[in-house]
Amino acid sequence: MTQAKDVALIFELSKQGRVGHSLPNLDIEEQPLESLLPEAYVREEEPELPEVSELQIMRHYTALSKRNHGVDSGFYPLGSCTMKYNPKINEDIARLPGLVHVHPYQPEEQVQGSLKMLYSLQTALAEITGMDEVTLQPAAGAHGEWTGLMMIRAYHEANGDKKRTKVVVPDSAHGTNPASATVAGFESVTVRTNEAGLVDLDHLREVVNEETAALMLTNPNTLGLFEADIQEMADIIHRAGGKLYYDGANSNAILGIARPGDMGFDVVHLNLHKTFTGPHGGGGPGSGPVGVKKELVPFLPKPVLVNDDGFFRFDSDRPQSIGRVKPYYGNYGINLRAYTYIRTMGPDGLRQVSENAVLNANYMMRRLESYYDLPYAQHCKHEFVLSGKRQKKLGVRTLDIAKRLLDFGYHPPTIYFPLNVEECMMIEPTETESKETLDEFIEAMIQIAKEAEESPELVQEAPHHTVIKRLDETLAARKPILRYEMKKETV
């Protein structure tokens, strides 16, 4: 019997002349392709596509699907990624014919239902975040970051303040923060984290000056800790003339409990594909709406979706706008799923989401703190970090622990991030997991900790039960093979 590890590439299954699908005979006169397309668009040779049967295709991709791990197949505690369950009612709504069969180029009067839905989503997100207006254009979180920073840049330039070229970013921040700042034309400046895992206010005062355009923060931060001094940080940045930017990657911890706008943030982006259950992974699609306070509204990407006395339309008469940042108006399908989720949960339900996410994370942290080092002992929010320093002294690295978890059927947590925690493991259980699931994962982690003491080679050589063992990750990163060269069959 063929084992899963022997699954061939789809190209390797190809057999010349094998047919997967056939088309009916033409009932009109056949036209040469050259008469239908300009010569520049006609291939000189047929594309080298695999020739396989429908049955082969089904078996091939079914076999591959069994090698995938997703939220629907098991616990996925990937820190800072909010791998929560995506309710299937979202998919039902997203497949309604009246919503599926619209086109962005249809006249506005023909798609009032869809535009009303998008406008209602904007309004809901503005209320949830404490912002004045929201754009749904950005396609993902980093895209939202860049969009927000471009608006901040436009704001400063409109005020003749072109010397503001620096964005302050904590040393525990997501890597997208300094990257987005660079792409937006800023220089990133790092502010230290103190011993409590929070922004060092004294150092923040040192690095903020008349060249500071913005401070980018997640709250809770990437260590899963709430920045309790956030309003003082807002005062520091605002007194210097800068803006406070909220990276909404960790919004799952504060829904219905706290709003960035009330903390002093001027710009917010959200990840609808995370917090609001648009499915994510595999490269997208995502959705990264951006909300702003009133003084930044003129710089929103255009067109701006507005409610004109009950008629929903796109307004392009925005002379100070940073311009369009995406074709059409955002990723419609993900926005629709997020709207469905918000309407399904309601205000009380969204608050319960965050309460349960925080409860689950704290429960796991307290159960595991006796077996792994806990860098920050205070209560966490939606996620927490452990350190494998104790196991490293026994010859077992955090990478080994992550690989060993695969043998138990779990996707490992995020490892070696944030960078300011040695042998870091970042765990985010989300609110959708039961106590039974959490307990099973905890027991696996405890067993691995004991194995590190009693039989470290068992962990060092893991995984033992997966189809693929350890990869040469350096070779894969430096010399990836991203295309298949088909071999010509000889007759």
Swiss-Prot record:
It catalyses: N(6)-[(R)-lipoyl]-L-lysyl-[glycine-cleavage complex H protein] + glycine + H(+) = N(6)-[(R)-S(8)-aminomethyldihydrolipoyl]-L-lysyl-[glycine-cleavage complex H protein] + CO2. Its EC number is 1.4.4.2. Keywords: Oxidoreductase, Pyridoxal phosphate. InterPro entries: GcvPB, GDC-P_C, GDC-P_N, GDC_P, PyrdxlP-dep_Trfase, PyrdxlP-dep_Trfase_major, PyrdxlP-dep_Trfase_small. GO terms for molecular function: glycine binding; glycine dehydrogenase (decarboxylating) activity; pyridoxal phosphate binding. It holds the Pfam family GDC-P. One of its GO terms (cellular component) is cytosol. Its cofactor is pyridoxal 5'-phosphate. The keyword Cell wall biogenesis/degradation does not apply. The modification N6-(pyridoxal phosphate)lysine is found at residue 274. One of its GO terms (biological process) is glycine decarboxylation via glycine cleavage system. NCBIfam families: PRK04366.1 (NF003346). Belongs to the GcvP family. C-terminal subunit subfamily. PANTHER family: GLYCINE DEHYDROGENASE (DECARBOXYLATING), MITOCHONDRIAL, GLYCINE DEHYDROGENASE, DECARBOXYLATING. HAMAP family: GcvPB. The glycine cleavage system is composed of four proteins: P, T, L and H. In this organism, the P 'protein' is a heterodimer of two subunits. The glycine cleavage system catalyzes the degradation of glycine. The P protein binds the alpha-amino group of glycine through its pyridoxal phosphate cofactor; CO(2) is released and the remaining methylamine moiety is then transferred to the lipoamide cofactor of the H protein. This is Probable glycine dehydrogenase (decarboxylating) subunit 2. The lineage of its organism: Bacteria, Bacillati, Bacillota, Bacilli, Bacillales. The gene is gcvPB.
